[in-house]
Amino acid sequence: MKNLLHKIASAFVVCAALVAFTACNDDDGKVKKPQVSSELVGSYTPHYFKEVPDEWGGEPSRLYLEVAAAWTDPDNIPGIDLSESMGMPAGSFVMPFNTILDLVSAIGSQFVSSGLVQLDLHSDGLFAAKYHDVVVEEGADIMTTIFSPTFAEAVSVFPSAETAAVLPEGALSFYTESNLFFAAVSKDFIRAIEKQEGMEILSEIDKMLGAYKGLSVVSTDSHYAIPFKYTFEGGVLRLYVDRAMMLLYVKLLKDVLGGLGLDPSQMMGLDPAVILDDLFNATTELQIAVYLKKM
């Protein structure tokens, strides 16, 4: 069972982490480029949705990634017990979820505003991007990289010769349907990864979709796609997922985490499954949204 979950985790990460988009293919393997009829076709730059005043009178902070929640009991918001990580007795230092979500919004906003330069959604369903790579200093720990990221001055481009070896053009695409934005990945691209890595990915994804009924993943002969909700008003695209959409994946995520055999002693006393349950039980609404301004 653990090996199966490892395979499922690998397959799921490939699809979810690519966060993206697919093209349809001819029987001879050549990429078709059907036209996408969508109001979203165009070029975008990061857009902030909120300014937070600086308590010392400096420039306000701008937030580009929204993480918002409505709480079951606003006066008693639970949190995560970080006492063990601080070398303190259990229950001494509990960070409430609302503070944690604000922190996630602030950290994510750095990556959106400083990392992404431009996103292009093309009429053939493909996309392009200009961005700054995250610079990982030698010897830097992961927490430093996350909380205080450094970005390269040079602007990188996708697709390019440098990115083609990892993500060939046509592997990722998008389409809109029924007021949803679908991010999809080509099955031919996944087959290429299977051949290169000697892994069974497609079959494990299909097993996962069969085992976890109700997941919102769309599977066709050519691609897998994951839907996102969106609004488009005044030239601003708000791309988001809500609590109901996330809830579909909670059981899968908990099972995958359980199958990884994580050592509790290395998790600072934290149980990801319990944290997920506590968060969703404490909320009536939860949204994660990114804002983009059409150029």
What is each stretch, according to the model?
Residues 1-12:
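Bacterial N-terminal signal peptides that target proteins for export
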Residues 2-3, 17-47, 282-284, 288-295:
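Bacterial Sec-dependent N-terminal signal peptides
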Residues 25-27, 53-61, 83-89:
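General N-terminal leader/first-domain-start detector
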Residues 36-76, 130, 292:
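Tryptophan-anchored aromatic micro-motifs
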Residues 56, 115-116, 268, 286-288:
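Flexible low-complexity loop/turn motifs enriched in small/helix-breaking residues
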Residues 62-102, 256-276:
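A solvent-exposed, charged loop/short amphipathic helix patch at secondary-structure junctions
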Residues 83-252, 256:
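Contiguous, well-ordered beta-strand patches that form the walls/edges
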Residues 275-283:
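Short, exposed beta-strand-loop hairpins at the edges of beta-sheets
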